[in-house]
């Protein structure tokens, strides 16, 4: 009798995706983040589902309902802390996953890469609307500042902003619709993640060498299931350490005060995972210019496959590109730091230089490095 795993229509899909999937024999721990992201998404959906049972999306009661969850609901404090810090873990894994894709040339699987960028944008949108829900000071003012950027769009901007708000400012209608968005978007993320996997399994995984691995494949189970399990243990360990010992360290103290439209916080800033883009937005004095730079900072990922000039796929054997890659990583850390600082010197000039360097590295220096490495590898005799 044939194995049910290989014949049953549903089991067959699972089998081809997670059990008998041929995987390169040399993929490193940098390939763990896909499965970690899947688990992060499941954690966020489950904890979010239980939070939604007790949350009320009304400006008068939203803040109190979150306090009620933490004080009166059984393990509500744990569910909320896991959800808030789970978002940070999600973005940490996302950034490392994208970084891995850039370093090892995984972006040359164009469909997988483009769906991945759409996924990144959708997760960012989900996190943004979610941050507004507790209706603290930073929630309210963050929502006001970011949605107000829409008004920079010529001609239709103001109408668009008021349409998103459901009124003339961020208010009850905005909170209600943001809760609706925050509930629906994760399921769209799940659908996109399935499409992402579908395209990935059309080509098979890339590997650190960047060389076609077809001649040396091994089954996903048990080799990579056990490897992913180790990654999951570390993920849970870090998440639990964060959620149990220091749950508020990544949040903003202003969010412990209920939203007050009459009192602006001294420094309005988003969560840490948006600070790099926020720094780029603030580095341009013009409002529309800032919005375009903000969009470009993420959408630039879509043109990375077009900027690949090297004869080798991976950066593993390309020291010049490696150096530029790590400068880019350090630059992103710098932008994250600047995004959290007040708008004054020397932070303004550092932010502007870091923003320039970000675009310069991706658009000019890295493609040039690829051409230079091609030249250096050519026989000179």
Curated annotation (Swiss-Prot):
One of its GO terms (molecular function) is metal ion binding. It is a multi-pass membrane protein. It is found in: Mitochondrion inner membrane. GO terms for cellular component: mitochondrial inner membrane; respiratory chain complex III. It holds the Pfam family Cytochrome_B. The keyword Oxidoreductase does not apply. One of its GO terms (biological process) is mitochondrial electron transport, ubiquinol to cytochrome c. Keywords: Electron transport, Heme, Iron, Membrane, Metal-binding, Mitochondrion, Mitochondrion inner membrane, Respiratory chain, Transmembrane, Transmembrane helix, Transport, Ubiquinone. Heme b b566 binds at residues 97, 196. Binds 2 heme b groups non-covalently. Heme b b562 binds at residues 83, 182. Its cofactor is heme b. Disulfide bonds: none annotated. It comes from the Eukaryota. A ubiquinone binds at residue 201. Component of the ubiquinol-cytochrome c reductase complex (complex III or cytochrome b-c1 complex) that is part of the mitochondrial respiratory chain. The b-c1 complex mediates electron transfer from ubiquinol to cytochrome c. Contributes to the generation of a proton gradient across the mitochondrial membrane that is then used for ATP synthesis. The cytochrome bc1 complex contains 11 subunits: 3 respiratory subunits (MT-CYB, CYC1 and UQCRFS1), 2 core proteins (UQCRC1 and UQCRC2) and 6 low-molecular weight proteins (UQCRH/QCR6, UQCRB/QCR7, UQCRQ/QCR8, UQCR10/QCR9, UQCR11/QCR10 and a cleavage product of UQCRFS1). This cytochrome bc1 complex then forms a dimer. Heme 1 (or BL or b562) is low-potential and absorbs at about 562 nm, and heme 2 (or BH or b566) is high-potential and absorbs at about 566 nm. PANTHER family: CYTOCHROME B. Belongs to the cytochrome b family. This is Cytochrome b. It comes from Antechinus bellus.
